[in-house]
């Protein structure tokens, strides 16, 4: 009996409950995380102006925008630049109140060496419950102007809802009227939730800007001045999409945005040093912004490998957007014509393989997929697909990424998301009048998904299985197989497997401690790395090894609990849920998702990053822009839930996470104050481990195999 481990984890049972108590109702998430809160709040406070009136609800209400009356004598300012005015809409949110990221970016702007004699950097700051620096108040919104000595407050107003389109349009009109220049641009700073949810989370008013509200704000300002912004940039997550481009196209020449979530530090504002006495075209400035963002990210990763983050940033030519939308509209008309119950499963299998975004830092499925990768996998090389690919590529004037299959711009294609989110996407597409044939295709796709059952017998509990073990020179690798019926093969969408440990056989529990010890299992690893061969065999290639933690006290005596998150030929990515704790000064804890990568470069694995998770409600999905530095904490606790084998009324195994909880949890404490690292090594007793396959059919139904011993 491994008493040291078990005793630690009996104590951890209580600690896991602490973060919920400590976090209270703080919003520390991107828009999806707070969306349910926003809706609840808006429903109870209808007096709030211009908040979203339902889940993804789009409306056409409009209020005339006016320019705020200046509160200071502009003659007291030094000469105002007349070349470029860059307006920064800085919604501080929890990124400022909890982490001070907005203040840090203001510092970056000050130290960039901006030519303020010819250029205006104008900031509208608000939307945070607390400002960590700069003497700003959460009760106010402040206009800041960058001078050669730093930012100076120009005007101050009572706190305004930065999720109200009127607030944004008023700020833009303010910039046009009082800081005239040859060229104007806009940076939208904060969280982003993609086209369905929108941009910006005002902590004080619990509101954000949906795409219809963003369009309204731009029409009442940029449109009213009958001009165009040179570029609009999102220093925010998930906003490089065709749907967002459709909103910006009438009002700007270029869009600069990220397909993926951004790390908390966001853009590197050193690019402002490029400003001079001549107007810089948007495509050129876009290249500066993309390069500085990527260069700074790589710089951080080299110093702090465990702050690694996937990075994407693109500059999109909005003048080429209309042609891309038209080409996509033609392609999806063709695809929709061929969509029926026979080829639907093949389409689902390809959709499941498309690069998606936002999944690592969130439990939420945003449905954001790379357009070019989608066309590559689904397009079948038709002329319409090739024309759409070429048109989309023409939109992307410059992009960079450290990810595979991130081409520069996304589209929202929800798959296996909740119905509310899917319906909100459809409603958004209708409001934007975006590629009507694409909207029709999605509706037909979902009609089949929710229609009559395509697979009569989806159970795989009685399927033939086998395990073949061979040594690859380093480890014993098991090829675990499961035979599907012809009907199951035809309707196969995706699959995966779980590796479970027999708690009693591995020595974690005894019959004296729990009379049901023989039925108790620990979840060790989950993966979707399976292949279906031409003979209908589903294969899971599992190297009979596991990832352990090593600290100054030695090697952990149970493996880390991992879920594989990204299928790649070059590396294996896993997530582990953990609790970080400090004891010495102010006692604090932080729940996180830790990313571990195993590759040829890191055969023993490396901790790449940690994302905070603060859930007050299990139904709230959170995606964080912030990365956690493990060295700021003293202890990391990793746990595994122990559950009893549970079956349905027909005797089939349920999903492990629906098994009856035993009340026991096993795991380890890792000392972060000294040296710590991951170690990959073979399982001591693979005969104490089992594999369970799961299979999803084309309509999203899931079934589970019986437990398959590894040896």
Describe each model-derived feature in a short phrase.
Residues 14-22:
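Bacterial N-terminal signal peptides
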Residues 125-226, 236-237, 242-243, 259-260:
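Catalytic-core segments of thiol-dependent peptidases
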Residues 92-93, 127, 190-192, 415-417:
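Residue-level signal for short, function-critical loop segments
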Residues 85-90, 120-125, 184-188, 230-234, ...:
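Structural recognition of the beta-strand scaffold that forms the well-ordered cores
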Residues 3-13:
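Bacterial N-terminal signal peptides that target proteins for export
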Residues 34, 39-180:
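N-terminal extension/subdomain marker
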Residues 47-79, 195, 199-234, 239-711:
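Terminal, contiguous helix-loop blocks that mediate binding/assembly
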């Amino acid at each position: 009996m491994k008493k040291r481990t078990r005793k630690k984890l009996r104590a951890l049972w209580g600690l896991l409950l602490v973060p919920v108590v400590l976090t209270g109702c703080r919003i520390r998430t991107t828009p999806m995380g707070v969306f349910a809160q926003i809706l609840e709040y808006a429903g109870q406070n209808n007096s709030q102006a211009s908040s979203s009136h339902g889940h993804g609800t789009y409306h056409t209400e409009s209020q005339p925008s006016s320019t705020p009356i200046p509160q200071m004598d502009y003659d007291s300012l030094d000469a105002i630049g007349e070349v470029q005015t860059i307006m920064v809409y800085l919604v501080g949110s929890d990124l400022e109140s909890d982490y001070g990221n907005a203040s840090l970016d203001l510092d970056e702007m000050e130290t960039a060496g901006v030519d303020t004699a010819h250029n205006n950097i104008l900031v509208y700051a608000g939307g945070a419950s607390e400002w960590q620096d700069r003497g700003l108040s959460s009760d106010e919104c402040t206009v800041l102007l960058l001078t050669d000595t730093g930012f100076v407050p120009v005007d101050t107003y009572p706190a305004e809802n930065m999720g109200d389109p009127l607030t944004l349009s008023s700020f833009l009109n303010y910039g046009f009227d009082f800081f005239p220049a040859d060229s104007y641009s806009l940076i939208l700073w904060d969280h982003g939730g993609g086209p369905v949810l929108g941009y910006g989370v005002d902590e004080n008013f619990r509101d954000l800007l949906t795409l219809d509200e963003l369009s309204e704000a731009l029409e009442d300002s940029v449109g009213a001045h009958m001009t165009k912004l040179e570029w609009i940039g999102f220093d925010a997550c998930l906003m490089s999409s065709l749907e967002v481009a459709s909103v910006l196209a009438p009002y700007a020449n270029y869009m600069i945005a990220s397909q993926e979530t951004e790390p908390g530090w966001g853009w590197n504002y050193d690019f402002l040093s490029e400003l001079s006495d001549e107007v810089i075209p948007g495509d050129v400035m876009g290249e500066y912004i993309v390069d500085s963002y990527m260069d700074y990210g790589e710089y951080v990763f080299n110093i702090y490998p465990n702050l690694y983050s996937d990075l994407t940033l693109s500059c999109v030519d909005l003048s080429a957007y209309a042609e891309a939308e038209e080409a996509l509209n033609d392609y999806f008309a063709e695809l929709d014509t061929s969509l029926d119950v026979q080829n639907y499963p093949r389409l689902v299998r390809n959709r499941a393989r498309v690069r998606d975004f936002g999944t690592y830092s969130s439990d939420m499925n945003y449905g954001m997929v790379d357009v070019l990768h989608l066309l590559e996998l689904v397009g079948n090389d038709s002329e319409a697909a090739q024309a759409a690919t070429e048109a989309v590529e023409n939109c992307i004037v410059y992009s960079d990424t450290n990810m595979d299959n991130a081409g520069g711009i996304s589209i929202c294609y929800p798959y296996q998301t909740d119905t509310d989110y899917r319906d909100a996407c459809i409603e958004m597409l209708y409001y934007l009048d975006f590629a009507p044939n694409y909207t029709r295709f999605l509706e037909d796709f979902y009609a089949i998904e929710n229609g009559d059952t395509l697979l009569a017998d989806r159970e795989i509990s009685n399927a033939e299985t086998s395990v073949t073990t061979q040594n690859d020179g380093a480890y014993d690798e098991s090829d675990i197989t499961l035979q599907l019926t012809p009907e199951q093969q035809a309707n196969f969408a995706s699959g995966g497997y779980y590796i479970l440990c027999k708690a009693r056989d591995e020595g974690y529990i005894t019959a004296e401690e729990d009379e049901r010890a023989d039925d108790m299992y620990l979840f060790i690893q989950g993966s979707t790395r399976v292949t279906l061969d031409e003979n209908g065999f589903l294969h899971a290639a599992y190297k009979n090894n596991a990832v352990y933690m090593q600290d100054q006290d030695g090697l952990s005596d149970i493996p880390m609990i991992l879920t594989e998150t990204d299928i790649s030929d070059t590396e294996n990515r896993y997530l582990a849920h953990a609790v970080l704790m400090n004891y010495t000064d102010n006692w604090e804890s932080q729940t996180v998702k830790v990313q571990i990568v195993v590759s040829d470069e890191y055969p023993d694995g490396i901790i790449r990053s940690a994302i905070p998770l603060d859930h007050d409600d299990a139904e709230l999905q959170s995606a964080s822009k912030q990365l956690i530095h493990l060295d700021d904490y003293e202890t990391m606790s990793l746990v595994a839930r122990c559950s009893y084998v549970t079956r349905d009324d027909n005797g089939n195994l349920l999903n492990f996470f629906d098994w009856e909880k035993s009340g026991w949890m096993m795991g380890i404490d890792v000392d972060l104050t000294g040296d710590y690292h991951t170690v990959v090594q073979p399982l001591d007793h693979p005969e104490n481990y089992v594999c369970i396959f799961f299979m999803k059919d084309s309509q999203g139904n899931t079934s589970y195999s019986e437990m398959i011993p590894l040896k």
